[in-house]
Amino acid sequence: MNTENRQPAPDRPHQTARTESVKECQHRRPLVSTRSWLAAILLAFASPCLADSSAVWNLNPTSGNWNTAANWTPATVPGGVTGTARFGVSNVTQVSNSSFVAIGTISFSRGASAFTITGTPSNGISFVGQGIVNDSGVVQNFVVAADQAGGAGTIVFTESSRAGRMAQFTCNAPTSVGTGLPVIAFEISANAGSAIFDNLGGVTSGAIGGQTDFFDQCSAANATLVNEGALVTGAIGGMTYFVLRADAGHAVITSKGSAVGGGGGGGTVFESTAKGADATLIAEGGNNGGGGGTIQFWDSSDGGLAKVRVSGNGNLDISKHSAAPIRIGSLEGDGPVYLGSKRLTVGNNNLSTIYSGTMQDGGTNGGAGGSLTKSGSGSLTLGGNNTYTGGTTVSAGSLLVNGTTGSGAVNVDAGTLGGGGTMTGAVTIGTGSGGGAFLAPAGGTKIQATLTLQSGLTFNAGATYTYTFKARKKKAKSDKVIANGVTINSGASIALSGQSKGAVTPGLTLTLIRNTSVNPINGTFANLPDGGIVTINGNNFQANYGGGDGNDLTLTVVQ
């Protein structure tokens, strides 16, 4: 497994020494200290000195300092659960805090100026009420800052506060190793609304990037989040974490790759019992030797209906998941997928997608024996050369293999297996306890295909082989299955579908199954006995289970 350009997500013990190499950063994840900081905020807010008050930012304030009472009307610094800071037209639109701010609502009135409100290093802004209400008609900017002295700002949404709409958040990266963490955090039941969040990549070797965290029962809602790649060698990209029962809602979350050799890509991580919900999760590749973005599922998290898209060396990694299987809605793109020893179930959102990357064992947590299950009513087309060593299961919809599956066995419990690729492991169609399992090389398309099985093929009772062809006079294009040994158990059937232009020349032979084993085909389809004649589009075909080189299933046109 090539992991040269793949940057793992940082682990989460306390923020102590940050002089490790980028690879060592994977053993650290800075959320514990983040929660400690949030606890301090709540204690501070509980203090009686934080009385509720509301005020309007002046047209001509004396400075851009939030904490200067003279900048407001009435001359009081707004704060508290029911407190509202109102912004309209002003000649000073760069606003920052010199001490901690706890505010219920920041409101931008219709026609208000475009503001930039910055949480300065070592000072936080906490929304403890409604959150942000923007009626101005323009985007309002919020910035989490960091400085060379190690200070880091923070913006926190807690209780049921909302980030609102037409709001742009930028979370800067620490400017040195071992310093405070700039973070945007959502606590209790807050959500991100339809805001935009940009977590900037690391700017110092060994340091992390900006970070947005969702805790408890918070949701990313309809937000757009971008985790940027690192800007220097040895740094880590911006990150988004979902922890406890938080979910990604309907958000679009993009983890970008780094454009610098040895720089880490951005990352999105789900842990505890967090959920991908109905989000779109994107991991883009890096350039110039930079690491790709990453999407990771840890612990007992669940991908739900999330649409996962990976490209370049941008990757999906489930190797740190502790439960089996881990579900996602759909998978597409050409980036690697790391399974470790886990089972990935794809298809819960019923979409039809094409994945042409490499699905493989390994990942940040290592492990072998990874496996794949296709679920849902849509189709998943595998176009790459997959190397995972566990099995492949089709439980619903269609799995179309135009590349390769892993080396394990392939079982179709329900749904359709097809394509023109290659499978290493033994293939079994049906469970023997009911219908609904199909082998169909064309996979419901109008293009005939040859599916190659390097091991044996078994049709159980209730299974169906769907075979299609197009014929004209002496020529034909047809499906074909190549298998190293074939068993057709009692109760399996074949569905024949052909298109022909006029009468087909007698003697034309179609090979339905090419058996590469020295042994004959064991059994016959219930509706196609050996020597039986079937009529398709006015042409008569005779079945032969000893055709071809003596042990293939063929149909020959007869008078």
Predicted regions and their residues:
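Fold-core signature of tandem repeat domains
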Residues: 169, 184-186, 197, 212-214, ...
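Solvent-exposed adhesion/ligand-recognition segments of exported proteins
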Residues: 5, 45-194, 198-209, 213-220, ...
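Tight coil/turn sites that cap or link beta-strands
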Residues: 111, 137, 147, 166, ...
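Right-handed beta-helix
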Residues: 268, 295, 342-365, 380-382, ...
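Short, T/G/N/S-enriched strand-turn elements that build extracellular solenoid repeat scaffolds
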Residues: 70-77, 93-99, 106, 116-117, ...
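Sec-dependent, cleavable N-terminal signal peptides
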Residues: 1-53
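Short structural boundary motif marking the start of a folded domain
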Residues: 52-56, 342, 370
